[in-house]
């Protein structure tokens, strides 16, 4: 939340969110600022880095970390997958670990012990170290800017319709 709040306070984007994709061989973390000015890329990066450095230096809010861990532990114990069927979600979890290690198909289902471990590690600066190692010191990063073009879908539809019309005109009655 501190990175999101810093970006919003600086008016970088109208909506800011982060995500972590771990169900692949090379997991990645992303921070997205929707409706941001493309000319503020450097400011975007500077705010993120500055906020993360401050978190590492001053530590994270311990109560917020504990609340987050408790939230996910509760969801895990309750098997709360919102509107998704339990079996489907367990299957996806099994697949995520099995895909890259055929000897550990059930590794992601045996998560309960990790919550106590995370609570202990949080008191020892574990999350700050993760931020330093995997975000601040990581040289494998990129910034991607997507700029919408008004009317692009309609333009593509018109091109496709024209192409299909020309193709249809090239066919005989039997081929149609």
Task: Say what each PLM segment does.
Residues 1:
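Structured ligand/cofactor/substrate-binding pocket environments in proteins
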Residues 151-156, 160-176:
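N-terminal leader/propeptide and maturation segments of large enzyme subunits in energy/redox metabolism
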Residues 131-134, 176:
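Core subunits and conserved enzymes of cellular information-processing
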Residues 4-120, 139-149, 155-157:
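M16 family metallopeptidases and their MPP-like homologs
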């Amino acid at each position: 939340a501190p990175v999101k709040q810093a970006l919003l306070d600086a008016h970088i984007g109208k909506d800011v969110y982060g995500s972590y994709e771990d169900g692949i061989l090379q997991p990645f973390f992303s921070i997205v600022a929707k409706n941001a000015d493309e000319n503020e890329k450097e400011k975007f990066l500077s705010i993120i880095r500055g906020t993360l450095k401050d978190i590492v230096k001053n530590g994270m809010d311990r109560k917020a970390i504990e609340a987050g861990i408790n939230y996910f532990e509760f969801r895990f114990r309750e098997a709360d997958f919102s509107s998704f069927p339990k079996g489907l979600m367990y299957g996806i979890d099994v697949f995520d670990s099995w895909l890259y290690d055929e000897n550990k198909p059930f590794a992601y289902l045996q998560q309960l012990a990790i919550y106590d471990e995370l609570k202990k590690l949080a008191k020892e600066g574990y999350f700050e170290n993760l931020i330093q190692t995997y975000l601040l010191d990581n040289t494998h990063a990129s910034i991607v800017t997507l700029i919408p073009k008004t009317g692009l879908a309609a333009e593509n539809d018109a091109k496709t319709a024209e192409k299909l019309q020309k193709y249809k005109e090239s066919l005989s009655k039997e081929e149609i």
